[in-house]
Regions:
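HhH-family (HhH-GPD) DNA N-glycosylase catalytic core used in base-excision repair
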Residues: 1-290
Length: 290
Protein backbone atom coordinates (compact mmCIF):
# COMPACT_ATOMS: atom_id res chain seq x y z
CA UNK A 1 0.00 0.00 0.00
CA UNK A 2 1.03 3.61 -0.62
CA UNK A 3 0.66 6.71 1.53
CA UNK A 4 -0.12 10.26 0.44
CA UNK A 5 0.08 13.23 2.82
CA UNK A 6 -1.67 16.52 2.11
CA UNK A 7 -1.60 19.77 4.08
CA UNK A 8 -4.79 21.77 3.73
CA UNK A 9 -5.42 25.27 5.04
CA UNK A 10 -8.78 25.36 6.80
CA UNK A 11 -10.68 28.60 6.34
CA UNK A 12 -12.74 29.58 9.35
CA UNK A 13 -13.09 27.95 12.77
CA UNK A 14 -12.21 24.27 13.14
CA UNK A 15 -11.33 22.05 16.07
CA UNK A 16 -10.20 18.51 15.38
CA UNK A 17 -10.90 17.62 19.02
CA UNK A 18 -14.50 18.87 18.92
CA UNK A 19 -15.18 17.22 15.56
CA UNK A 20 -13.69 13.93 16.73
CA UNK A 21 -15.78 13.97 19.93
CA UNK A 22 -18.90 14.64 17.86
CA UNK A 23 -18.16 11.77 15.47
CA UNK A 24 -17.38 9.36 18.30
CA UNK A 25 -20.91 10.00 19.60
CA UNK A 26 -22.57 9.90 16.17
CA UNK A 27 -24.84 6.87 16.67
CA UNK A 28 -25.46 5.93 13.01
CA UNK A 29 -21.75 5.50 12.24
CA UNK A 30 -19.74 6.24 15.37
CA UNK A 31 -16.02 6.74 14.94
CA UNK A 32 -14.05 3.91 16.49
CA UNK A 33 -11.93 4.61 19.53
CA UNK A 34 -8.64 3.57 17.88
CA UNK A 35 -7.29 7.05 17.10
CA UNK A 36 -4.14 8.28 18.79
CA UNK A 37 -4.39 11.41 20.95
CA UNK A 38 -4.75 14.59 18.90
CA UNK A 39 -5.57 12.63 15.75
CA UNK A 40 -8.67 11.42 13.96
CA UNK A 41 -8.36 8.09 12.16
CA UNK A 42 -10.94 6.33 10.02
CA UNK A 43 -11.23 3.73 7.26
CA UNK A 44 -13.55 4.19 4.30
CA UNK A 45 -14.44 3.44 0.70
CA UNK A 46 -13.05 5.89 -1.86
CA UNK A 47 -15.81 6.93 -4.25
CA UNK A 48 -13.45 7.25 -7.22
CA UNK A 49 -12.68 3.52 -7.40
CA UNK A 50 -14.33 2.00 -4.28
CA UNK A 51 -10.95 0.97 -2.92
CA UNK A 52 -10.37 1.00 0.82
CA UNK A 53 -8.35 3.80 2.41
CA UNK A 54 -7.16 4.69 5.89
CA UNK A 55 -7.03 8.38 6.78
CA UNK A 56 -5.27 9.96 9.72
CA UNK A 57 -5.91 13.66 10.29
CA UNK A 58 -4.04 16.03 12.58
CA UNK A 59 -4.41 19.75 13.22
CA UNK A 60 -1.69 22.37 13.40
CA UNK A 61 -3.43 25.69 14.08
CA UNK A 62 -5.38 26.40 10.85
CA UNK A 63 -3.77 23.59 8.84
CA UNK A 64 -5.14 20.06 8.52
CA UNK A 65 -2.65 17.34 7.67
CA UNK A 66 -4.41 14.43 5.96
CA UNK A 67 -2.41 11.21 5.53
CA UNK A 68 -4.18 8.56 3.44
CA UNK A 69 -2.99 5.00 2.90
CA UNK A 70 -4.37 2.52 0.37
CA UNK A 71 -4.02 0.89 -3.03
CA UNK A 72 -6.38 3.18 -4.96
CA UNK A 73 -6.56 6.83 -5.98
CA UNK A 74 -5.02 8.56 -2.98
CA UNK A 75 -5.56 12.09 -4.29
CA UNK A 76 -9.28 11.37 -4.47
CA UNK A 77 -9.11 9.70 -1.07
CA UNK A 78 -7.61 12.84 0.47
CA UNK A 79 -10.20 15.07 -1.21
CA UNK A 80 -12.98 12.83 0.06
CA UNK A 81 -11.58 12.97 3.60
CA UNK A 82 -11.59 16.76 3.42
CA UNK A 83 -15.21 16.66 2.29
CA UNK A 84 -16.51 14.25 4.93
CA UNK A 85 -14.79 16.34 7.61
CA UNK A 86 -16.12 19.58 6.03
CA UNK A 87 -12.56 20.90 5.78
CA UNK A 88 -13.21 21.99 2.18
CA UNK A 89 -15.82 24.56 3.28
CA UNK A 90 -14.85 28.23 3.55
CA UNK A 91 -16.40 28.92 6.95
CA UNK A 92 -15.13 32.43 7.53
CA UNK A 93 -18.76 33.57 7.42
CA UNK A 94 -19.92 31.08 10.09
CA UNK A 95 -19.33 33.61 12.87
CA UNK A 96 -21.73 35.94 11.07
CA UNK A 97 -24.56 33.49 11.74
CA UNK A 98 -23.80 33.80 15.45
CA UNK A 99 -24.09 37.57 15.22
CA UNK A 100 -27.54 37.25 13.65
CA UNK A 101 -28.87 34.47 15.89
CA UNK A 102 -28.06 34.28 19.62
CA UNK A 103 -29.22 30.65 19.76
CA UNK A 104 -26.57 29.67 17.22
CA UNK A 105 -24.05 31.89 19.01
CA UNK A 106 -24.62 29.79 22.12
CA UNK A 107 -24.33 26.57 20.09
CA UNK A 108 -21.03 27.68 18.59
CA UNK A 109 -19.71 28.53 22.05
CA UNK A 110 -20.67 25.10 23.41
CA UNK A 111 -19.26 23.23 20.39
CA UNK A 112 -16.23 25.34 19.45
CA UNK A 113 -14.83 24.55 16.03
CA UNK A 114 -17.29 21.76 15.23
CA UNK A 115 -17.61 20.92 11.55
CA UNK A 116 -20.27 18.35 10.61
CA UNK A 117 -18.91 14.85 9.98
CA UNK A 118 -20.08 11.27 10.32
CA UNK A 119 -20.74 9.60 6.97
CA UNK A 120 -17.84 8.97 4.61
CA UNK A 121 -19.94 9.33 1.47
CA UNK A 122 -23.47 9.70 0.12
CA UNK A 123 -23.37 5.96 -0.61
CA UNK A 124 -22.84 5.11 3.05
CA UNK A 125 -25.50 7.62 4.12
CA UNK A 126 -27.94 6.05 1.66
CA UNK A 127 -27.18 2.56 2.97
CA UNK A 128 -27.83 3.84 6.49
CA UNK A 129 -31.12 5.41 5.41
CA UNK A 130 -32.26 1.99 4.19
CA UNK A 131 -30.98 0.04 7.19
CA UNK A 132 -32.62 2.42 9.66
CA UNK A 133 -36.10 2.27 8.12
CA UNK A 134 -38.62 1.07 10.74
CA UNK A 135 -35.82 0.48 13.26
CA UNK A 136 -34.51 2.44 16.19
CA UNK A 137 -31.18 4.12 15.58
CA UNK A 138 -29.36 1.78 17.96
CA UNK A 139 -30.86 -1.30 16.28
CA UNK A 140 -29.85 -0.07 12.85
CA UNK A 141 -26.36 0.78 14.11
CA UNK A 142 -25.93 -2.79 15.36
CA UNK A 143 -27.13 -4.12 12.01
CA UNK A 144 -24.65 -1.91 10.16
CA UNK A 145 -21.83 -3.03 12.45
CA UNK A 146 -22.69 -6.69 11.80
CA UNK A 147 -22.55 -6.13 8.03
CA UNK A 148 -19.13 -4.49 8.37
CA UNK A 149 -17.84 -7.28 10.63
CA UNK A 150 -18.97 -10.00 8.22
CA UNK A 151 -18.42 -8.38 4.83
CA UNK A 152 -16.37 -5.21 5.30
CA UNK A 153 -12.71 -4.52 4.71
CA UNK A 154 -10.55 -3.33 7.65
CA UNK A 155 -13.65 -1.82 9.22
CA UNK A 156 -14.95 -0.13 6.08
CA UNK A 157 -18.50 -0.71 4.84
CA UNK A 158 -18.71 -3.11 1.85
CA UNK A 159 -18.33 -1.44 -1.53
CA UNK A 160 -21.34 -1.24 -3.85
CA UNK A 161 -20.21 -4.02 -6.20
CA UNK A 162 -19.91 -6.40 -3.25
CA UNK A 163 -23.18 -5.20 -1.75
CA UNK A 164 -24.97 -6.04 -4.99
CA UNK A 165 -23.87 -9.67 -4.66
CA UNK A 166 -24.66 -10.15 -0.98
CA UNK A 167 -27.73 -11.90 0.36
CA UNK A 168 -27.95 -10.37 3.81
CA UNK A 169 -31.28 -11.92 4.74
CA UNK A 170 -32.65 -8.57 5.86
CA UNK A 171 -36.32 -8.11 6.78
CA UNK A 172 -38.86 -6.54 4.45
CA UNK A 173 -37.49 -4.84 1.36
CA UNK A 174 -34.21 -3.71 2.91
CA UNK A 175 -32.16 -6.09 0.77
CA UNK A 176 -33.86 -4.89 -2.41
CA UNK A 177 -33.37 -1.25 -1.43
CA UNK A 178 -29.70 -1.78 -0.51
CA UNK A 179 -29.08 -3.29 -3.93
CA UNK A 180 -30.77 -0.25 -5.49
CA UNK A 181 -28.45 2.01 -3.49
CA UNK A 182 -25.43 -0.01 -4.60
CA UNK A 183 -26.48 0.18 -8.25
CA UNK A 184 -27.04 3.93 -7.96
CA UNK A 185 -23.58 4.38 -6.44
CA UNK A 186 -21.96 2.43 -9.27
CA UNK A 187 -23.90 4.53 -11.81
CA UNK A 188 -22.65 7.77 -10.26
CA UNK A 189 -26.04 8.90 -8.93
CA UNK A 190 -24.63 9.22 -5.42
CA UNK A 191 -21.35 10.91 -6.31
CA UNK A 192 -20.45 13.34 -3.54
CA UNK A 193 -18.80 15.97 -5.71
CA UNK A 194 -21.69 15.93 -8.18
CA UNK A 195 -24.28 16.34 -5.44
CA UNK A 196 -22.28 19.17 -3.88
CA UNK A 197 -22.24 20.98 -7.23
CA UNK A 198 -26.06 21.14 -7.34
CA UNK A 199 -28.45 23.33 -5.42
CA UNK A 200 -29.42 21.31 -2.32
CA UNK A 201 -33.08 21.03 -3.30
CA UNK A 202 -32.10 19.80 -6.78
CA UNK A 203 -29.71 17.25 -5.29
CA UNK A 204 -32.42 15.94 -2.95
CA UNK A 205 -34.80 15.51 -5.89
CA UNK A 206 -32.12 13.59 -7.80
CA UNK A 207 -31.51 11.24 -4.87
CA UNK A 208 -35.24 10.62 -4.50
CA UNK A 209 -35.00 8.71 -7.81
CA UNK A 210 -33.14 5.91 -5.99
CA UNK A 211 -35.57 3.18 -4.98
CA UNK A 212 -36.09 2.99 -1.25
CA UNK A 213 -35.01 6.53 -0.42
CA UNK A 214 -37.85 8.74 0.80
CA UNK A 215 -37.75 12.43 1.71
CA UNK A 216 -35.88 11.94 5.00
CA UNK A 217 -33.35 9.56 3.45
CA UNK A 218 -32.71 11.79 0.44
CA UNK A 219 -32.05 14.79 2.67
CA UNK A 220 -29.71 12.70 4.81
CA UNK A 221 -27.74 11.62 1.74
CA UNK A 222 -27.30 15.19 0.50
CA UNK A 223 -26.87 17.11 3.75
CA UNK A 224 -24.84 14.58 5.74
CA UNK A 225 -23.52 12.17 3.11
CA UNK A 226 -22.34 14.79 0.61
CA UNK A 227 -21.90 17.20 3.55
CA UNK A 228 -23.63 20.10 1.82
CA UNK A 229 -23.22 23.06 4.20
CA UNK A 230 -26.35 25.01 3.34
CA UNK A 231 -29.37 22.74 3.11
CA UNK A 232 -32.45 22.45 5.27
CA UNK A 233 -33.47 19.13 6.89
CA UNK A 234 -37.24 19.42 6.72
CA UNK A 235 -38.07 15.89 7.95
CA UNK A 236 -36.20 15.86 11.29
CA UNK A 237 -38.70 15.63 14.13
CA UNK A 238 -36.04 16.01 16.83
CA UNK A 239 -34.81 19.18 15.16
CA UNK A 240 -38.36 20.50 15.00
CA UNK A 241 -38.74 19.82 18.72
CA UNK A 242 -35.49 21.64 19.42
CA UNK A 243 -36.63 24.65 17.40
CA UNK A 244 -39.75 24.90 19.56
CA UNK A 245 -37.72 24.58 22.74
CA UNK A 246 -35.01 27.06 21.77
CA UNK A 247 -37.01 29.66 19.86
CA UNK A 248 -40.44 29.31 21.42
CA UNK A 249 -43.85 27.90 20.43
CA UNK A 250 -45.06 28.86 17.00
CA UNK A 251 -41.59 29.42 15.54
CA UNK A 252 -40.83 27.22 12.54
CA UNK A 253 -37.64 25.84 11.06
CA UNK A 254 -38.24 27.72 7.82
CA UNK A 255 -38.63 30.97 9.71
CA UNK A 256 -35.63 30.78 12.03
CA UNK A 257 -33.26 29.22 9.48
CA UNK A 258 -33.33 32.31 7.27
CA UNK A 259 -30.64 33.76 9.55
CA UNK A 260 -28.47 30.65 9.20
CA UNK A 261 -27.60 31.02 5.51
CA UNK A 262 -25.22 29.95 4.04
CA UNK A 263 -24.69 27.40 6.83
CA UNK A 264 -28.15 26.01 7.46
CA UNK A 265 -26.92 22.42 7.65
CA UNK A 266 -24.23 23.36 10.14
CA UNK A 267 -26.67 25.22 12.38
CA UNK A 268 -29.09 22.28 12.33
CA UNK A 269 -26.31 19.82 13.20
CA UNK A 270 -25.21 22.00 16.12
CA UNK A 271 -28.75 22.14 17.52
CA UNK A 272 -29.24 18.38 17.16
CA UNK A 273 -25.89 17.68 18.81
CA UNK A 274 -26.73 19.90 21.77
CA UNK A 275 -30.17 18.33 22.09
CA UNK A 276 -28.64 14.87 22.36
CA UNK A 277 -26.07 16.14 24.86
CA UNK A 278 -28.91 17.55 26.99
CA UNK A 279 -31.60 14.86 26.62
CA UNK A 280 -29.56 11.70 25.81
CA UNK A 281 -32.54 10.54 23.73
CA UNK A 282 -30.55 8.24 21.49
CA UNK A 283 -28.19 7.09 24.24
CA UNK A 284 -31.16 6.17 26.43
CA UNK A 285 -32.51 4.03 23.58
CA UNK A 286 -29.19 2.18 23.42
CA UNK A 287 -29.46 1.38 27.14
CA UNK A 288 -33.08 0.27 26.84
CA UNK A 289 -34.43 3.10 28.97
CA UNK A 290 -37.11 4.21 26.48
Amino acid sequence: MRTRTVDREVQGPWSLATSREFWEGFAPAALGGHSEPDTLSTTYRVEADWSCADATVTQHEDTATIAVTGDGDLDEAADQAARFLALDVDARGWIGVARRDPVIADAQAQLPGLRPCGFHSPYEAAAWAVLSQRLRIVQAARLRAEIIDRHGDRGAFPGPAQLLRLDLGLPGRKGEYLRAVAAAALDGQLDGAALRSMEPEQAVRAVRDVKGLGPFGAELVVLRGANVPDGLPTHERRLDAEITERYGPGRTLTEVSAAWRPFRTWAAVHLRALRERRTHEIDRQSRGLV
